[in-house]
Amino acid sequence: MILPPKVIHPTGEPEFTLKKSVISALIADTFNGKIHIEWEPQAQVTTLGQLAFFIQYLKVGHRFMPWVEECPLRYTSPNAPKKINVLGSFVLSILAGYTRYAHITRIQGDCVNAPLLGMTKVVGEDSARNALKAIEENEGIAWLQKHLYQSYSPLLELPWILDADVTIKTLYGHQEGATVGYNPHKPGRPSHTYHTYMIANVRLILEVEVQAGNRSSSAYTAPGLWTLLDRIPRAHWPAFIRGDSDWGSDTVMSEAEQRGVDYLFKLKKSPLVKKLIHQYHCKSGWEKTHEGFEAFATELKLITWKTARRVVIVRRRLGKDRAQAPSNALPHQFSLVEPAEDLSAFEYSVLVTSLDAEVITIVQHYRDRADCENNFDEIKNQWGWCGFVTQKLAPCRLIARMIALVYNWWSLFVRLVEADKHYEAIVSRPLLLHGVGKQTQHAGQTTLTITSSHGRESYVKAAYMRVCAFFDELKAIAPQLTPLQCWYRILSEAMKKYLKGAVLKPPDLINYVS
């Protein structure tokens, strides 16, 4: 009897194929009856349906591709992600309002906007985080500073005001530079300090420096200010520098006077400043300003000052319910309420300035500085300055400038749509960015169909028709223009409220390049 051959390699246990139930749809019982819900993972749709208009703006203005090409990100591995995929992922996540690297996962399935930016895919959070670590810090800062300057430099031909201030970013881990310092929101909690320089009124970021949490005074902000001014041509310097009471030191003011730039700061209420308030409290000659404020101009020389300087005492009458000092005041605490002859009371502040403008103008200039806090509130809470944290300080410095750059790009783009006012991101994103976009292709033509649930959809459609008409006119003459001249044309349209019919003229290209 011939036996069957032995099996050298047993087949093992037989596999039992289980029938997998394919769920075609789910049923949800709603107040409007039952509905059938299906998923379509391969559909070419996006929740940022109106982003295509912003991408056109970046392309016509020559903002995105030069920024990508000049990025000092270098990989040696053949499996490393493409540079444009990394930077494009950052732009998409920042525009969407994300605040953590992990949030990039939310847009990894966006197969519509990524190709529009020239990308092949959206990278993961680890690739994005490691990319910033791979950029040499000094090279990365110089790269971002250059493109930040290019985003706003045409506007510096107009008279402008430089606001300098510091904001605190509270930290909850063990990051480099996370030290305990001045932190009014979370006392005793470690933080980083963001030393920021802004263009007043138009709310654009000139530069931002991230430092340790215990370096919040103007002594650490001023060196960056002077370095920034050194990079700006002298003819484009601000009309004056504006800062809070931390800037009213002799060191800062002497440096400003030596450089020939005017300033407007607030003074701390030192004993001599309090004495000055007592001295002029009952004097006549106070000038009425806006909204119940009064001002008196004089001179003051503090002990630490090398020379006397012009100061403006500002006061406002308090209501009767605020006229008395609080009963729970600390011992030796100075009360700002001084009794007047008519038994009313005032609150005081003292400004120091090198400007020779009228008192009313100076007071209004400093009151306008309150918009600086609105800028901080927007970019911290509606963009990403409160997030994107890493263990090392260098990536934090790079991402802070990257967020400022995308913020500038978006703010100027929104001005193209609505030139009369600044829309914060909490308003502009739902209005001009969000919307379901479905991409279809037929006969070689790609169509993006947008569905917006915003109540002002008709306004947005009309606004984008105007923007597209402007870009069509610009593209018609673009072959005759340089990238710099195209950007000047775009900013002239975006800032027409401030230009009042004028057009920004680019510099002589030969001298500009040299």
Q: Which residues does each predicted region cover?
A:
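Plant-biased, long, compositionally biased intrinsically disordered regulatory regions enriched
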Residues: 57-59
